[in-house]
Amino acid sequence: MKKQFRAGAAAGLLAAVSLFSAVLLTGCSEEKKPVVSAETAEAVTESASEAGVWPGDENRIVLKLASTLSPEMRALNALSGFAEEVFRETSGRIDIQIYDSSSLGDQVDYLNGIRQGTVEMCLVSTAALEAIDPHFVIFGMPGLFTSAEKVNRFYESDICRELLDEFRQKSGIRSLALFHDGIRNVWLKEARVYRAEDFAGLRLRIPTGVRIREKEFQALKAEVVPLPLSDCSAALQSGYIDGLENNVETIVNSDMIGQIDYQVKTEHAYSTLLLLINEQILMQISENDRNILTDCARKYSGIAFQQYMEGQEAAYRAAEQAGIETIELEEKEKRRIRESLLSATKEMLEDIFPEGFYEKVDAL
């Protein structure tokens, strides 16, 4: 299990952190790796000492942040900066520990954990949130979000704010910030797809607990296989799946990259992530530190967005350099696929939203 977490540099502080973390993370005995820079740790240690705030004091709060992403992913890099700045600006009173690479399970585990309070924070896809609130299906509707800018407009809109507020009241989970995962395409080992009919019979991995993806590819007569992301490499290698749908950055920063032969540019959906926190735990933090936490979340969401926009071309280039051939679908085939996916999933909206909701979001 790989863990990254915040800690002070001074020996006395580090010992206290280790003891405190051991109590919180019962059963997690692997070596811990501090990721706070030495300069930050020294400055925070001095500041905390002057303020009388020490690790282990009741004023010190440790927040576990779980993610399926690997450390190379831009969103996770931004979260590391977020955690460090929160640690520094609160003089060590808030210590955010990042558990990457599915080390605490998959997204379903995180959502269960954050409601139970065993995981305080997580970064999960909006598609995964559909399992506990069907309203999040809107984020993944085929062809609805065709650009990062449109996604941002929706997230900042009154429509989305109302959705997130209702979600917070019902679930006890607050969204702190939006992160971009990007356009989703289909990635295949050996098999090729040029037409909608070519999906028939293909075993395609979809994320666990995401009904919209299931409906989409069942509409194309593919055999959908729900799997955690961490199981995909072995599933490809064994032939258990023929491929998966995902964004380019996830593929090139995983060990799947050496097993995939083709990228089919379906561009069927746009993938987004939300940084979530347990509302009850957030409200236990002092108002000043709570403001620091929420402001830093928004700041590093913006940083991650700029990095995402700058890094997309490099990610696609990395896929090409790895020997992955891109299959550009003819526009009429791409349109047929999207229409098929939309037809299969739009009925989900009718059971959840008032008439005209899709069109209202589409017009943003």
Task: Describe the predicted segments one by one.
Residues 1-47:
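Gram-positive cell-envelope targeting signals
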Residues 28-149, 159, 168-169, 174-364:
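N-terminal secretory/targeting leader peptides
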Residues 163-164:
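Short, compositionally biased "basic patch" segments
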